[in-house]
């Protein structure tokens, strides 16, 4: 049986600094927190120029509905989705940054809730997905920027705006979606005209799924990044 209370052996970047440490790295971590929290602050408010400032040229974004795309394409797709009625917002709940001693590479994890409003057959409801963003940051010259942004999708649920009206759900079709973002994937496919990826990183408890494998892989990639290696984007 999988140990549900531990992370994969050897996945912790032991040489990285994540709290305390020298004051110069505290300042760098504050900069990285501001960048990470810029994702929900900027994207949800359509502040696209500010959103672009999070990334380095050539950076990629990897989400359930977009797949792996250059960040500029993600912005274009986000705008198009909004114009078609997609209403996605985020709530942030804290950050933690691992940074190398040189202050040139970092991984910031941002706990958040993705909340998407849907309207189906006259019923308004939100799907809320607990997740963690994973930002792969690099300092080029004097400027920090993300080279890759991914997520762990941990659990989700449906919340009716009006408890008296709730949409019908095809239980058999629902079973075909991953446990960490089952309702999000179901309704994104049903309403957005997209094919949602089913193998996104999940939670440690998603035993026997590709989502657990990708959960562990993302931790290993974070360690590789902090140790100066190149990762497969």
From Swiss-Prot:
SUPFAM superfamilies reported in the protein's UniProt record: NTF2-like
Q: Which domain of life is it from?
A: Eukaryota
One Pfam family from the record: SnoaL_4
Q: What does this protein do?
A: May contribute to the ability of the fungus to cause disease on pea plants.
The UniProt entry's sequence similarity note says: Belongs to the PEP2 family.
Identify this protein by name: PEP2-like protein NECHADRAFT_97050
